[in-house]
Amino acid sequence: MRHKPTTPLDRLGALRGLLTISDEDSTAYLRSYGELFVDSPENTKADYERGVPLRGYPQGSSNELAALYKVIHLLCTLGSVEKMYMPPTIDPEQSVLVNQILFERMVAKDLRLSPGDKVLELGCGCGAIAEHIAELTGATPYGVNLDPSQIQKAWRNPNLPRANFAVGDFNKALEFDDSSLDAVYAIQPMTYVSDHAHTFSEVFRVLKPGGVFVINDVAALDAYDRADEHQRTLIQHTRELTVFGGFWYYRYWEDVYRAAGFELVSSVGRPAVELIRKEVALFDRYESAFRLLAKLHVIPK
């Protein structure tokens, strides 16, 4: 299990970033929750069966989203999710980080890459996943991300080609030539898609014939009932905790793939509940520590 992207130095840097955060960035971060996670779009199984159109996430290119990630990636680096995603549970006895590594090995296999192939990550964060995929496959990594601070961190990584990582928005045209990439993947940024048809068509355009597009993200399953207050509240709490945007029935996802021209090879549901619980417990401990520091006036309240 050699791949360990988050080092003590990374965590120290994240802590320093949080302790020195500007009032402007702090205020923008706190305000973003009220802007981004209220009345987020949902399409359920019942909607699908009635033929209700898929409704995209309207703030997918917003300044508020960038403000959120400018701060939250520091918080995640303190924990186990510097890579900004909760992996599906592959081995419940192992940590979040180990499950990330196991899951990324699965993704690397699904991408069917050879050494020297070009692979793009949508919503690449600081490039930690891209580094691992490149290590596993020998492919040349590329990445786009909405938050400039995370791209700057990717640029500082000597294991990543700086010129291949850029501030970018998958809700707009991808800055790649037609048929120029061997594979594209996205690990949990896709709930911010504003127009599914546009984004999936853009990915299809930049892929070579036979290229692969792999995504992992949140999806509503058959049992979700929006009329059930308990279920609705649980989803909203999870949305705010894991900062996902839209919540769409999985068959909408499958249809979007096909409509863009893809052949759907596999669609698999994998839960992440146990790992989310582990990470919540870790952040509860951090919260207690930060409250103590604030009480002692070491950090601002």
Regions found by a protein language model. Name each.
Residues 263-295:
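Conserved catalytic loop of SAM-dependent methyltransferase domains
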Residues 219-244:
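Short, glycine-/aromatic-enriched active-site segment of Class I SAM-dependent methyltransferases
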Residues 120, 128-172:
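Class I SAM-dependent methyltransferase SAM/SAH-binding core
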Residues 197-212:
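A short glycine-rich, Lys/Arg-flanked "PGG" loop and its adjoining helix->strand segment in the class I
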Residues 245-261:
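Short alpha-helix
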Residues 4-76:
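N-terminal auxiliary segments of SAM/dcSAM-dependent transferases
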Residues 171-184:
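A short acidic, Gly/Pro-enriched loop at the edge of an enzyme's catalytic core
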Residues 97-115:
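Conserved alpha-helix/loop element of class I SAM-dependent methyltransferases that forms part
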